UniProtKB/Swiss-Prot annotation:
InterPro entries according to UniProt: Ribosomal_uS15, Ribosomal_uS15_bac-type, uS15_NS1_RNA-bd_sf
GO CC terms in record: cytosolic small ribosomal subunit
GO biological process, any: translation
Keywords carried by this UniProt record: Ribonucleoprotein, Ribosomal protein, RNA-binding, rRNA-binding
Assigned protein family: Belongs to the universal ribosomal protein uS15 family.
Keyword Cell cycle attached: no
Record text on subunit structure and interactions: Part of the 30S ribosomal subunit. Forms a bridge to the 50S subunit in the 70S ribosome, contacting the 23S rRNA.
GO molecular function: rRNA binding; structural constituent of ribosome
UniProt-recorded name of the protein: Small ribosomal subunit protein uS15
Pfam families according to UniProt: Ribosomal_S15 (PF00312)
Family matches, as SUPFAM superfamilies: S15/NS1 RNA-binding domain
Length: 89
């Protein structure tokens, strides 16, 4: 259910804006999106896992907040990120 260390490093490398960047909104949204995808697959199999479902909703809300922040601060970076991640907005 969680992200492996190798996958986390790959995602950070793909979405970082500088060589030492690990906490930019782009990186945080990419990591949350990966966790959301993994948890969604888990919930397809375990439909009655309501504790994990609540965790999923918390993660989706956190990702939404980060995307709203990025949209407010830098529209171009926001558009690039949602295009790369394949998000609907």
């Amino acid at each position: 259910m969680s992200i492996t260390a190798e996958r986390r490093t790959a995602l950070i490398g793909e979405y970082q804006t500088a060589a030492t960047d690990t906490g930019s909104p782009e990186v945080q949204v990419a990591l949350l999106s990966e966790r959301i995808t993994n948890l969604t697959e888990h919930l397809k199999t375990h439909a009655k896992d309501f504790h994990s479902r609540r965790g999923l909703l918390v993660m989706v809300g956190k990702r939404r907040g980060l995307l709203d922040y990025l949209k407010r601060k830098d529209q171009a970076r926001y558009q690039t990120l949602i295009g790369r991640l394949g998000l609907r907005r």
